[in-house]
A protein has these predicted regions:
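Intrinsic-disorder-associated, low-complexity terminal segments enriched in Asp/Asn/His/Tyr and depleted
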Residues: 3, 16-17
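Aromatic (phenylalanine/tyrosine) cluster motif
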Residues: 3-6, 27
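Charged interaction/catalytic cores of defense and host-pathogen modules
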Residues: 29-174
């Protein structure tokens, strides 16, 4: 018989009052910390989604840095990525007649891995946000609208997955 070990344990500390904490791989986070992380993540992701041509990919880089520097979010991404072997170049971004489109994987782990791997490529290679956005066929629209459509289409689901996870963790803390 095998058992799956979880990194997360809910513990209660008693001092003057009850403090609920989330123990995450030796890293303790209380409700206030989780709210701060959630708030900062929403701000960083909003900045990224509202990027314009003058920003290039500065906010995309800040978005990735926030994910990579935040242990709870990075552990969540890593826990999903390890169960997927999808190649984003073959199964996420498809090119047809010179234009690219997003093919959304049905499996959540595959979707998260594809988005994160694509984010890594975009930021490591310092690829032009303008150039990538213009590869998606949108008809006639303004440059900034094209960039924002591209970011929403490609990365908004990743933001939703992370936000949902943070909310689930807050609920788990409150119920303990």
């Amino acid at each position: 018989m095998s058992y799956m070990l979880f990194k997360r344990e809910i513990i209660i500390w008693r001092r003057d009052n009850i403090i609920l904490c989330l123990l995450w791989g030796g890293f303790e986070v209380n409700m206030e910390d989780l709210r701060k992380i959630s708030f900062e993540f929403r701000r960083v992701s909003s900045d990224m989604l509202n990027s314009i041509t003058d920003d290039n990919n500065v906010y995309l880089i800040k978005f990735r840095e926030f994910i990579d520097d935040n242990k709870i979010i990075k552990d969540y991404i890593d826990s999903k990525v390890k169960y997927s072997s999808i190649d984003w170049q073959k199964s996420f971004i498809e090119e047809d007649c010179g234009y690219k489109s997003v093919i959304i994987p049905q499996n959540k782990n595959d979707h998260i891995k594809a988005m994160y791997d694509y984010l890594v490529v975009m930021t490591d290679r310092n690829k032009s946000l303008n150039g990538e956005a213009f590869n998606f066929h949108l008809g006639r629209c303004k440059v900034n609208e094209r960039i924002q459509f591209y970011l929403n289409r490609v990365f908004l689901p990743l933001i939703h997955y992370i936000n949902d996870y943070l909310i689930e963790e807050m609920i788990a803390l409150q119920e303990s």
